[in-house]
Structure formats: structure tokens, C-alpha cells
Curated annotation (Swiss-Prot):
It is an enzyme of class 7 (translocase). It is found in: Cell inner membrane; Cytoplasm. May bind 1 zinc ion per subunit. Keywords: ATP-binding, Cell inner membrane, Cell membrane, Cytoplasm, Membrane, Metal-binding, Nucleotide-binding, Protein transport, Translocase, Translocation, Transport, Zinc. It comes from Helicobacter pylori (strain G27). PROSITE patterns: SECA (PS01312), SECA_MOTOR_DEAD (PS51196). ATP binds at residues 93, 111-115, 501. Pfam families: P-loop_SecA (PF21090), SEC-C (PF02810), SecA_DEAD (PF07517), SecA_PP_bind (PF01043), SecA_SW (PF07516). This is Protein translocase subunit SecA. Zn(2+) binds at residues 841, 843, 852-853. Its EC number is 7.4.2.8. SMART domains: SecA_DEAD (SM00957), SecA_PP_bind (SM00958). GO terms for molecular function: ATP binding; metal ion binding; protein-exporting ATPase activity.
Amino acid sequence: MIKAIIGKIIGTRNDRWIKQYKKQVLAINALEPAYEKMSDDELQNAFEELKKRVRSTEKDLQEKTLLEVLPESFAITREASKRILKMRHFDVQLIGGMVLNDGKIAEMKTGEGKTLVATLAVALNALKGESVYVVTVNDYLAHRDSKEMEPLYQFLGYSVGTITASVRDDDERLEIYSKDIVYGTNNEFGFDYLRDNMKYSLEHKVQKSHAFAIVDEVDSILIDEARTPLIISGPVDRRMENYNKADEVAKSMQVETDFTIDEKNRAILITEEGIKKAENLFGVDNLYKIENAALSHHLDQALKANYLFFIDKDYIVANNEVVIVDEFTGRLSEGRRFSEGLHQALEAKEGVSIKEESQTLADITFQNYFRMFSKLSGMTGTAQTEATEFLEIYNLEVVSIPTNLAIKRKDLNDLIYKSEKEKFDAVILKIKELHDKGQPVLVGTASIEKSETLHALLKKERIPHTVLNAKQHTKEAEIIKDAGLKGAVTIATNMAGRGVDIKLTDEIKELGGLYIIGTERHESRRIDNQLRGRSGRQGDPGTSQFYLSLEDNLLRIFGSDRIKGVMEKLGLKDGEHIESKLVTRAVENAQKKVENLHFESRKHLLEYDDVANEQRKSVYKFRDELLDVNYDISAKIAENREYALNQIFSKLKAFDHQNLSEEELLGLKNVLKEDFNAHVSLEDLKKATPIEKFVAEKLKSDYENKMKVLDSEQRSRIERIVYLQILDNAWREHLYTMDNLKTGINLRGYNQKDPLVEYKKESYNLFLEFIEDIKMEAIKTFSKIQFENEQDSSDAERYLDNFSEEREHESVTYRHEETLDEDLNVAMKAFSKTPKRNEPCPCQSGKKYKDCCAKSGPKKGLFAK
């Protein structure tokens, strides 16, 4: 209350920002007459001068220079837009452009021209000469926006590219990323970053820098999708568990008797009776013994799949596959899979083919990907409700931009009914009334299931209508465009065609504009506001109203008993409703509870990913160093050799390596032969003084002698690629270990320990082990490289060429848990640890390892072991 009073007296923080930006608008407008008089060539030359000025400035001072040239850049961009696109930026759009340039979020209502606003900040920041990324939620919007704005950018001397899922060729992607301005989806940008850090050549990396990104529909990408990490994964070399058996057990269990459901936290809690029943059905004595860990995990996932996840709400079944429905957008998330075996549990539940589990090869959250950018900004129609999260997680302020024309839409109070049936009956009556009048109506539902229910009711009443949900997603833009036609009735899940305007004729405006009916409050107020925002664009008339019932999930799970109490006291008859500010406030409080739960969940995910992110950055930085032809790889190998020998000698008699027993010397001799391919006699070891120096010089001379056959460039290239393979293999195994650690870490809470603290501690120790493993594995592998003195280096070149070609053109499935081809797994295992004695020999002789290279030493050839 006090804050509101102070805001009215001295103005809010937002008001003060807008006031400052308006001063800049005056400066930009003052330049307009001069630029209007210029010819096209003169205008283009003026912009080229700005480029020269910015690019001639020291990198650290370029941001300051951008602010200095902002008025000229914005004025030229606006004049160019008038000539090329026949659109002039309004003053409020200039403010939006300045907000974006300042690295903030511009909250602009539907129809205010966010696509055009972005051109101001994009054109300004591209002056620096680094690619600017414009991020959208889907391929359709990325392609549409880039094509619409490309003529303007070309006039200003910029090149434009669009990254979509259909661009499969690596060279084509590389060419697109070389453009000044790149449009694309958040998934494509994120996956390209991960793929870049699996490349074996710096030249083949597509993302050269992360200077500036504008995220369109920023709330959808940075909030709604923040809980789903981007993952590139490969098949697990482990036996598949019986998901069908776990599904049978789960289906035989009874709610309340065998388990309870915590709907607020979406969790299943198994009772003692349930544990006994499961043990009996699985045929085990103790479900929670270490050897039954997989069974208990699969049962947990099967219970979730059967009792917390519902078809046509959380997922659909299409083409013998379980496809996720995004809970926030209502769109199908094709290719994305639930992790930790939940997706396989859903496949077992629905009786479709079960796909194997996968192992993470590379992953990152959207939070940590977008936080890499030197400057990040965003646009959306709904951001204020999540302003705290944007500031806390991304350090992004939200600025509400005034509309160009006043909003005329009427937002009516919610109507609350006792039952869902009564609510839908009332909705049908209202739709019929509006349809008969000719006023278009857009009906929002929270799930596919509810939209299908409404569809059946309208069909029964013979009211013509169109349904837009994840099952009809291919027609999304077309359906939404037609939602403003006379008499149109459109049922939509919360996907509701973001980014597509519903334009109205004068006749429709006379009828009252687009009427919005919400059939249920979403868990997030922001999603409700998005639905309202479909109506009343650019000063158009419109109306919005929500119809609720006590049986709606939000009110049933999170709602206050006060609402039910009010309904009972009033003694409402069937079909009657209440309309009260008290009830509306209670609904909003319930939404705030859920929003806070989701915020904590996203923050929790980020806290864990921040730990992995530091490790990821360290590994990727080292990877880039290895890819650099100027990197001194020989020094790194020498360092590893010294480390490996220190490890070996530390296990012998402490500080007394000169008085080793014959048994210890024999053990040292065998280790040197098996691990380092160094043939040293027992007599030489006995005579060596000091022994550490003798062994070190022996290993070094052996290695240098066999590498003489290669010229320096070829040697460096081979050493770097082999080291990269070792690093990638070790990183893959480290990620698998980290996944396992994260899965079970919450159990530490039962032991009065903070799971996050324990995770940080153990992940740090695991990372130290990972570094040690790389050093040991690297020196062992390099010690086994063999050449014949008389052979030339053609084998080496042939290997390098073949490896590069295989590695760079590996087929990849583009999805949230991407899967690499089996061939890549074979290639990446080329330099794995020494095989077990009964495994096939890696030299491909067809013999067992114990009967081949283990006995006779490495075969002659490039990388024989």
C-alpha cells in the first residue's frame, strides 16, 4: 500500500525509465527531417560512416560508442524502414528499441509491432561487426520475421540468415552463422553451441561469438522452457530393464492403500503395504537393496506415468510414439523425451514400442546458454508477473512500454460455478449468443482433453467452429488469422498462436471486437494474460472473461476453502454462478503459490546446473585450446608423462625408490610394458640411479623416436586429435557419473545433510578424478602409437582425413535429447582404456586380446595397441 502511494507521488521506477527514454526520442525525431531529404545512396553512406566509427573504436569502448551514435542509427533505420517496408517506427517503438539496446526486457502488448522494434536494436548492435542473434519460439516465426525484415537490413548493408531445423548441411549452417544477423529458434542456437563443442576443428564451429541476442517471446523461452535442459545423448551400453513388468506392478497398486499422490509437488509416495505388494510381484525380498535399485526406480517412474501423467493433457500418442505436450504453450514437443526413464514408463503404459535409454554426451540449460551472451535482451507481451525471476536469474530488468493507442478491451470479472458441467453449459450458451450476433469468439482451454470436450459440446449444438490444439499445430497461423472473421468460433489451447496477429475489419469492431473466453485459469497468471492479449490489439475493442468451477485443477489443488465456503453459504442452485472480487483475489493467490513453486523448481535446477556449468566451461575452454594449431600439445604430453610417473612411483616405497625389492621392480617392469609399451629389463632397473630419471628419459626417448616419421605439423595434428578423443570419452563418462550423482543426491536430506552442498562437494571430487583420468589415459594411449621406420606418413594423413570426415558429418537426431549415431560411439571409443583379456583385440585381428596384443605387444601401424 505504502509503495503504491509513493509510486503515485514520485512515479514508479518504470515511469522514470520511460521519462529518460522520451528525451532520447526527441533527439531522434529532430534528425528525421534531415534524413528524409537524403537520397538512398546518401542515407546508406551515412550508415556506413556509423559502422566505421564504431568498428574503429577499441572493443572495450564500443558499447559507449553505440550509445553515442544511437540517435543517428535509430533515425536512419526508421527512415530506411519508411522507404523499404513502408512502415514508420512510432515513438513508443523507439523506446522499445532503446530498452532492448540497454539489455532489458521490453514488455509490449500484442499488436504493438515487436518485430519492427527489434530492427532498431539489431541494426545498432550489428555496427560492431559481430553477429546479432534474434531468437524466436518456432521455425515459422524465425522464417517469417527474417524474410519480412531482410530487405531493410540489406538496405543498411547487412546480411541475414535463418537457422531452422530443416537446415541439415554443416557447410550451410556455417554460412548462415557468418551473416551479420541470424534468426533462429532457441533450440537450434542451443544445440549448435553443444555441437560446436564436439567438433574437431575450430574452422567448423559455427558460433564464433555470443555478443548480443534478442529473445522474442522471452517469457516462453527463458521461463517456461527453463526446466528442460538441452541434451545430446547416445545409446547406453547397458542392459534394458523390464519396463513392462514395472508397469504391470504399478497398474495393480491401489491409491491410498499402496501409495499416496501429492498433486502439489507431483510426487508419488509408496506405503509399507505398497512396498510389500511390489516385492511380492517382483519376486524380491527387499525392494530397496542396492541390487534392486533399478527395480525401485522403474516402479517410481511407472507410478508417475500411470497416476500423474495423462494422455491428451501431458502427452499424446501418435504414430506408435509418446509425444510430449508442452504444459505452457500447448504445442507438441516432438523429439523431446522425459528423462530418467519416465518416457519409457509412459511408452510401457500406452503399449507402444519402448525406446532404449540414452546417456548424456553434452547438455546445457537455456539459463546458462543465454547467460553467456555479453548483452541479452528480450520482448514479450507478458513479463511483469515474472519480473523477480528475470532479475534474479538473468539480471534482466523489465520495462513496460506504453501502447501507441489506448487499450479499449474490457476485462470482466471471473464467473465461478460449482461444477465443470455447469461451467461448460454456461460457456456454450455464451458462445451461441456471440455466434448468433456475428461477433468472433476465441475460447481458451488448458489442455487438449478440455478442447476436445468443448468441441463435442459445440458439435452437438451444431455451432460451426475450429479447434486449435497440438494435434492441429501445422495449421496454427492460418487458424489464428481467421479467428477474427465474422461469426468465427475458435477453440484453442494456450498455444493460441503467439506471434500471429488477429486482425479485425471495421464491421467486427462495430460488433465489439474479438471476445475472449477462458474456460479455466492457468497455473500462471502470465498465460492468462497472454490469452486476454489476443484481443484489443492496437486500440481495437474487445472483451475477455474467465469461466471457472470448483472442479478446476487450480482451485481443487491450490484454491482456498474460503471459495467453497462462500459458494455453500450462498446456497447457489445448479447453473448459478458467483462473481466476486474476493473470489478473484483467492484465485490469484492460488496462482501465485504455483508460480512460486515453479520459480523454486527452476532456481533449484539452475543451482545444480551452475556446478556443472563451471566444469563445462573449463572443459570447453581446454577443448578450444587443443583445437588451436598453435597450442603446444607436446608440452602437455610431457606434463602428463611426468604426472603418470609420479603416480606410479608414489605407490612404491615412499621416498626410497632406490631400495626397491626385486618383486617391486618386477611389478614396475610389467606396468611400464603393459601401460606404456616400454620394454625395460630387470637388470637395467636395478642399475638405474636415480630410477625415476631413468624411466622418464626412457619413455620420452621411445616416444620421440617413433614420432620422427611425422613432420611437425602432422605430429601436432595427430596428437591434438587423439587428446581430443580421450577428453571427449572421459567427459562423456563424467557426465554419466554426474547424472547418477544428481539422481540420488536428494536422499542425503534424510541424513540431515544439504543435498546441494553434498552435490557441490562430490562433483568437485569427481571433476578432479576426471582430470586425473585424462592425464593417465592420454599418456598410456600416446605410448602405444607405433610406426615402422621405413613407412612414410600417408597412413597418418589417411586416418586424419577419414576421422575428420566421419566426425564432422555424423548423423544427428535433432531433439531435446538428441541421439548420436552408433558409428560415432565406435569412433569415440578408438582410444578407450585397455580392453579386458577376453574381449576382441582392438587391432581387429579377430583374436581375443589375451591371445594377441596383450601377449606380443602392439602391432605395427598407426594406432595399434
